Structures are given as C-alpha cells and as structure tokens.
A protein has these predicted regions:
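Short coil-to-helix segment of the ABC ATPase nucleotide-binding domain corresponding to the Q-loop/switch region
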Residues: 96-104
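The feature captures the beta-strand-to-loop junction immediately N-terminal to the Walker
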Residues: 44-46
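Conserved ABC transporter NBD signature motif
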Residues: 67-79
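Conserved ABC ATPase "signature" region
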Residues: 103, 107, 112-132, 184
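Conserved signature/switch motifs of ABC ATPase nucleotide-binding domains
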Residues: 135-138, 156
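Hydrophobic anchor residue at the start of the ABC signature
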Residues: 86, 150
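Helix-to-loop junction immediately C-terminal to a conserved catalytic motif
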Residues: 59
C-alpha cells in the first residue's frame, strides 16, 4: 500500500473567534483541510463563512483560537515568503514602479542585485507587462495591477499562492482573461494555489478541488474533486452538470441554516 502524500498545507481542527462590540463571533469551527503540493484548490461559500479568515490563517496573518495550521508539517506562526498573498485591492506600493514593486520581496530578503533583477524581468515577462515595467500603479488598469500583484508573489519565491477574491472587482472580460492567464502560470510553475471566490463558475473553472464552506460558524461542508478535463469549456454540458451539482451543495446547506 502506497504511503499517503505529505500535504504542503494542513488545517487541523482549526477554530477562530473574534471579539466584536462585546460579542464573541465564531468565524471558523473545527475546520480540517489537506492541500497537496501543486494542487489548485478553490474555497467557496457565502459571505461570512470564514473563507478569508482561513486564508489569512494559512498566510500567517491570523492565529487560530484552537487547532493548528501547518506547512510541510511545521506550525505556521507568522507570514513567510513561502506563502504569498494576492488581495482583491492589489496592495501595491503606489510610489514604486511595476519593476520595483515586483523587486521589493527579493531585495528585502537580501537576494543579490543581479539575481533579483533577472528574477524580476522573468516574472514581468511571464505576466505580459514588459512594456509597462517602468509604469506606476495609477497608470495601469485593474487587470494589469493584479498581474503585478501576482508577479510580486512569484518573484518572492513562494511555494503557495493564496488569492482572496483577486478578480472580484474586475469586469467580466478582464476576469475571464486573467483566469486563463492564471491557469497558464500555474501550469508552468507547478505552484500550489488556494483561491477564495464566491462565484461557482469561477471555482469550477479553475480548481482541482472545490471546497464548500458554510457560515455560522464557518465549517468545511464538502471537498469536491473536479473531474472535468482541462482546458474547460464553461458552455459544455459536462461543465453545466457540474455547476448544477455544486450549486445544489452550496445552496441546500444555506437553505437548512435559514429554515
């Protein structure tokens, strides 16, 4: 019998509570999740189900109230370059150019100048921003800014890319184009991606596995392998069948909570 694969990320019985105006808010309750190296996993659920909280715990920005988050079996206690975060609002330095935003991580880590420069140029080209390397964030479209944010994480030598609804504020055409580009980058780099979304179609289109979370407090309701071949056609009967199944799983539990 084969040995089980060691997960790159493991969430063990994680609960998280917050204090808000004198009340205790249960954001997560006994969450368990294993993510293998190279997987693309999407987290989906209604607002307030703890998706972003779970992502922040994996990033090291938040600590669990109980349970533990692990990377390669070692406790996650603080942010580290191995886990890079991409936010919906880009989180770029407005006073730095595209090139300097991407160079910030390697430079801060003491990477030799020539090596850092080569790394930056590699990822600038990978995200298609070679012509805009000297531009500033305010001179870029939303989609271009998000490409910079992705390149910045990649240039910092991340093994795990954590994405918190990164395309949620973009128009439909730009969002679809960036989904395709993200899958191309993932295929080339073999990185592990954990992607938060509230859109069922986006979750199915991108993921190896779609993890459904439920609110009040947030729990892992189901973990669903996506068996659709890549590249995926959102207009195909197979995709629509999967969308109906996933929609049913998502909304049936929410209906029970509301009843």
């Amino acid at each position: 019998m084969a040995e089980p694969t060691l997960p790159i990320i493991e969430i063990r019985n994680v609960s998280k509570t917050f204090q808000l105006q004198g009340q205790t808010i249960d954001a997560l309750k006994d969450a368990n999740l294993r993510i293998n190296q190279g997987e693309f996993v999407t987290l989906i659920g209604a607002s307030g189900c703890g998706k972003s909280t779970l992502l922040r715990i994996i990033a090291g920005f938040e600590k669990p109230t109980s349970g533990e988050a692990l990377m390669w079996s070692k406790p996650i206690t603080e942010p580290e370059p191995q886990r890079g975060m991409v936010f919906q609002d880009y989180a770029l330095f407005p006073w730095l150019s595209v090139r300097d935003n991407i160079a910030f991580g390697p430079t801060s880590r003491g990477v030799p100048r020539a090596q850092a420069r080569a790394t930056v140029e590699h990822f600038v080209d990978m995200v298609g921003l070679g012509r805009f390397a000297d531009a500033y964030p305010h001179q870029l479209s939303g989609g271009m800014r998000q490409r910079v944010a992705i390149a910045r994480v990649l240039a910092n030598d991340a093994e795990v890319v954590l994405m918190d609804e990164p395309f949620g504020a973009l128009d439909a055409m730009t969002r679809e184009r960036l989904q395709e580009e993200l899958l191309e980058i993932w295929a080339r780099t073999k990185l592990t991606v954990v992607f938060v979304t509230h859109a069922i179609e986006e979750a199915i289109f991108l993921a190896d596995r779609v993890v459904v979370m439920t609110p009040g407090p947030g729990r892992i309701e189901s973990d669903n392998p996506m068996l659709l071949a890549r590249p995926r056609d959102i207009a195909s009967p197979e995709f629509n069948d999967t969308r109906r199944v996933m929609s049913g799983k998502l909304h049936s539990h929410h209906g029970k909570k509301a009843a």
